[in-house]
Structure formats: C-alpha cells, structure tokens
Amino acid sequence: MNSRFTSAFTPFAVSLGLLLVMTSAFPTPGPLGEDFKNDTTPGRLLLTTPEKTEALIKRMVDKISAMRKEICEKNDECESSKDTLAENKLNLPKMEEKDGCFQSGFNQAICLIRTTAGLLEYQIYLDYLQNEYEGNRENVRDLRKNIRTLIQILKQKIADLITTPATNTDLLEKMQSSNEWVKNAKIILILRNLENFLQFSLRAIRMK
C-alpha cells in the first residue's frame, strides 16, 4: 500500500472508529438511582440516559453558580475586577473551535473526548478549591463527587480513546497565596471557567 493511499485512509479510519464507539455507547440506558450517585468506584459500569447526564451537568452548573454567589456576597467587586482575575493565569482547560463542542463545526465524538480530558485536567484545580474555599465545604465535596461521576459516564462512551493525565502537584503549590483577594480571585476564575466548560459540553450530551 503506497503512502498516498495510507495518508488518505487514516483520517477515515479514525472517524469511522469514533463513530463505532459512539454508536455502541448510547443505546444502553439504565436507571440513575441513589446507589449510582453515591458510588464513584473506578471501573464500575454506570448506566444512564443522555437526559439524566444532562441533568447532572445542570446541577453542577447550579452548584457552581451558588458558590460564586457565596464568595461575591463577601466582596462586592469580586465579579467586576477583570484585570485582577486576568493576572492570575492558571492555564485552565478551555473549549476551543478544534474541540468540536461549538455550534459551528460541532462533532459529538471529538467534543466528548475533549470534555472528558478537560474534566480530568480540572482535578488539580478542584484540589485547590477543596483546600482554599472558605464557604460551604459541602458544596465543594458535592461538586468533586459529581464531576468524578460524570467522568466515569463519559469514559464509557469514548472507550479507551483517552488516558488520565499526570497529576501536576507543582501547579497546586504555585497556586498557593497568602493574599486573601488573590486567593478568592483564583477560586472565582476556576469556578467561572469550569461552569463555561460544562455548559459547552451539554451539546454533545444532548445528542442521541
């Protein structure tokens, strides 16, 4: 087989493989009961429907909104000081055009892969929230648990097309700050970006 034929065939094979993964992933809906929500054991097969997964994401978005509001009640300028927030460059996972999650150029398989990878990358930032958030800590614990559950659901849909990134412990140390305002600014920035990330992922979840 010559190289020109191989190079033309490879993208088709990859796309076909992704489509086969997606086709086999969605037709197995099952109940999402209390046992499911309380059990995030790695490797456990989680059966759910796109509607219930969407509801899970919306609950997380509402939780994040409540956490941001809780912080802002203690600081009137927390959401308006964009310059201060911009200085705290945390290299947070974000959706880009190439990730297939935007309305223009939407690709369900690619979007699901990017969503799963991004949520795995967010784990270190959730560790920071767990350590530094001074509001209702139960909200942080619930958010972490729900994101782990969502990651498990999405991993089942994309099979073995993604690997867990290495934990960046150095980043967690670099994020530490004794300045209360800087700390809160980082928390707000993490929550805001995570909320946007989850909202973009909804388009892929809604597709059946």
From Swiss-Prot:
Annotated signal peptide: 1-29
InterPro entries found in the cross-reference section: 4_helix_cytokine-like_core, IL-6-like, IL-6/GCSF/MGF, IL6/GCSF/MGF_CS
GO molecular function, one term: interleukin-6 receptor binding
Glycosylation sites: N38
Annotated disulfide bonds: C72-C78, C101-C111
Keyword Signal: yes
Keyword tags: Acute phase, Cytokine, Disulfide bond, Glycoprotein, Growth factor, Phosphoprotein, Secreted, Signal
Regions annotated as coiled coil: none
GO BP term (any one): positive regulation of receptor signaling pathway via JAK-STAT
Modified residues (Phosphoserine): S81
Predominant subcellular localization, coarse grouping: secreted
SMART domains according to UniProt: IL6
Localization in the cell: Secreted
Quaternary state and interactors: Component of a hexamer of two molecules each of IL6, IL6R and IL6ST; first binds to IL6R to associate with the signaling subunit IL6ST. Interacts with IL6R (via the N-terminal ectodomain); this interaction may be affected by IL6R-binding with SORL1, hence decreasing IL6 cis signaling. Interacts with SORL1 (via the N-terminal ectodomain); this interaction leads to IL6 internalization and lysosomal degradation. May form a trimeric complex with the soluble SORL1 ectodomain and soluble IL6R receptor; this interaction might stabilize circulating IL6, hence promoting IL6 trans signaling.
Name by which UniProt lists this protein: Interleukin-6
Native source species: Bubalus carabanensis (Swamp type water buffalo)
Classification lineage: Eukaryota, Metazoa, Chordata, Craniata, Vertebrata
Gene name of the encoded protein: IL6
